Amino acid sequence: MARFVVLVIDSFGVGAMKDVTLVRPQDAGANTCGHILSQLPHLQLPTLETLGLINALGYAPGDMQPSDSATWGVAELQHEGGDTFMGHQEILGTRPLPPLRMPFRDVIDRVEQALVSAGWQVERRGDDLQFLWVNQAVAIGDNLEADLGQVYNITANLSVISFDDAIKIGRIVREQVQVGRVITFGGLLTDSQRILDAAESKEGRFIGINAPRSGAYDNGFQVVHMGYGVDEKVQVPQKLYEAGVPTVLVGKVADIVNNPYGVSWQNLVDSQRIMDITLNEFNTHPTAFICTNIQETDLAGHAEDVARYAERLQVVDRNLARLVEAMQPDDCLVVMADHGNDPTIGHSHHTREVVPVLVYQQGMIATQLGVRTTLSDVGATVCEFFRAPPPQNGRSFLSSLRFAGDTL
């Protein structure tokens, strides 16, 4: 009986990927962790420090130092860009495929027709570039925070329209388009005009709502991510189900990863609540895989708010200490990220960064896991840990973990 926890601190990268000068020059020099610690050198994250955060970062920009007891590595992104949805699919064993890129303007006609046919009131807003405005409460257009052309947003005022109805609109859009992701989200706004006032265009081809400016994150935020072309049958939850091991997803990962046979805690944003649920699930199940996402760090990155990012990291760190304290000798923990979102880089998009892979189990001897070429190595390790069939992608590093008393 054992538990394996993967905690994903959303967007907590540790340095730009080597290929950014070619594929994402706007991310050159990005380092989410490093630049936060440079601006706040006295920030203390003692649990992450012990687990090897500074080891993974590769230098000490503040008071925190490398750990002599850590098992750590870094992982490169195999998916293009830097994306939460594809990052988590990759973590859980999907081999990423090149995404379809298409501005919303290229599909606006058929999306509009499908919505009108389904009985929704649809207007076009904008001049040469246009987005859709549905039932005076929902905007549909390009996602301006992710890689342009890969994601469409449905931004709703949930004071006017129910989230269930917003999801119905999102599903109609999903049926009409082939981009990697459609995100339906909203918040409780006093005036729908706030969404319209946050409309922006980029590069003369993309138009949508600036999500942080819309106010959707501020009060009553809810979100569902609708993916394209991801096969849940080759992912970790399915493989563990075949081996009789339950999967628990907590936070944003539950919104974006299919888990039909397990427990999914969806529509959660508050970091403390997410960590409380994680610890409760950990204490409830003698055997389980638990994957938790901390989204508020990513939201702080989008808002380019270093102080907020650091404060959320402290919440995570305090609760990680509780989790480590509750662990038994057979339990394993991995702390990692899915991409970067450097709040100092000068734009509000994700940044393409390598991520830390920090591993803890009682009795473990300090080990360097090196550079993993895909996030899927974590999912492959989870499957081997539980003696389950491997996922589609990734190489397990379980055999690299060393413990006191091991013989060569």
Swiss-Prot record:
Cofactor binding notes: Binds 1 or 2 manganese ions.
Gene3D superfamilies according to UniProt: Alkaline Phosphatase, subunit A, Phosphopentomutase
Cofactor needs: Mn(2+)
A GO molecular function held by the record: phosphopentomutase activity
Domain of life: Bacteria
Disulfide bond positions: none
Keywords of the record: Manganese, Metal-binding
Binding, Mn(2+): D10, H302, D338, H339, H350
Pfam families documented for this protein: Metalloenzyme
One GO CC term, this protein: cytosol
InterPro entries attached to this UniProt entry: Alkaline_phosphatase_core_sf, DeoB, Metalloenzyme, Phosphopentomutase_DeoB_cap_sf
Biological process, per Gene Ontology: metabolic compound salvage; nucleotide metabolic process
Keyword Manganese: yes
The family this protein is said to belong to: Belongs to the phosphopentomutase family.
PANTHER family, alphabetized: PHOSPHOPENTOMUTASE
NCBIfam families assigned: PRK12383.1
Protein's UniProt name: Uncharacterized protein YhfW
Species this chain originates from: Escherichia coli (strain K12)
